[in-house]
């Protein structure tokens, strides 16, 4: 019996984005089984890119390789997600199964493909809020299988589709192997340039509207005022400038510029380092060039350095109005850092699995663009929980840290997640090739005109 042919659609697995990481780790496990013929259709990936040389499976880059293709690529926004090349990739690889793990608008074109009857379609959308848009639910209903990033998302789709979506449970991501606890946290802080007595509340979030930096800064300001602590700093691994918040304006508004650190990455020497905010560009501490900027997806820190940052944190906090998953929570837990998250969307599932602290939601509001409910956090409650955490003894915090790591090992492991995909792929009965890609062309001939002249009534 021939091997099943599986096409994974997502972001190029040599990138360090969340989607890329998920596909890379799952595909590595599945490829090692030697049970399937595997291919990757990579958004933001390019054929011939040297970063893809070591990829062992078949690779289809989505970016144009010729100047003549650029105009076609730029015509439709969804081409960046693969719409313009999808069918040519299908005709070359002839998959039995097509898999996509992204947002609805990144894969909905696959449902519209003329070749849809020829492949089993399994998706894992980022269900980050409720209620879900009716168009999204309709598309999910037409998939052959639907995984979810979280148990919360699974329950939302089950409820809102009245059981009509073929939900397969959750298949959550894990952290990269680089995220490990350090043996001596105090020495690690010294190595990173800080006093061992310095405490950190840390967050790793992109500078987007749904990441609630204004509320986080407000809660942290209130914590400083109510606790009287001067040894606890806020560390934000985020980008600026971006399409999100005006970070320097917020720092000034809440008077925390001298208490908040960021990660800068140098475009010249590729080094990263922590520093207080000093504009979008600053002098690199490593090589001295003036080309260091706040870390971003395009110019970011390595997993190894991000792990070093995470291991400085005493407490990790995820402060967003909604999350499809919120991977940094799990990455922090992998480093043994206790976690707090807003008690809404996927964060509700993750924070309970990790044994962390759910942060109270003050209210929900309906978002204009999507009709989904988004969370407004209770910043006073968050400030109170921050104070309670840092009032704990060192022994209590160490116990929390160990339990957080144990919960990470229990709930978030790549081999367990890949096994869920493997079990699904093995359960799919593939149709004979002659009924799909090898089927005869369906040619529709128009009715031949039998008269040279016809009346209007005819």
Task: Write out the residue ranges for each language-model feature.
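Conserved donor-binding/catalytic core segment of Leloir-type glycosyltransferases
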Residues: 8, 194-211, 217-220, 234-236
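A conserved mid-protein helix/loop that constitutes part of the nucleotide-sugar donor-binding site
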Residues: 20-24, 208-224, 245
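Donor nucleotide-sugar binding/catalytic pocket of nucleotide-sugar-dependent glycosyltransferases
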Residues: 142-184, 261-264
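A short helix/loop element that forms part of the nucleotide-sugar donor recognition site in Leloir-type
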Residues: 180-194
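Nucleotide-activated donor-binding/catalytic signature segment of Leloir-type glycosyltransferases, i.e.
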Residues: 244-308
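Aromatic "clamp/platform" in nucleotide-sugar-dependent glycosyltransferases that forms part
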Residues: 321
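A short, well-ordered alpha-helix in the C-terminal region of glycosyltransferases
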Residues: 388, 395-411
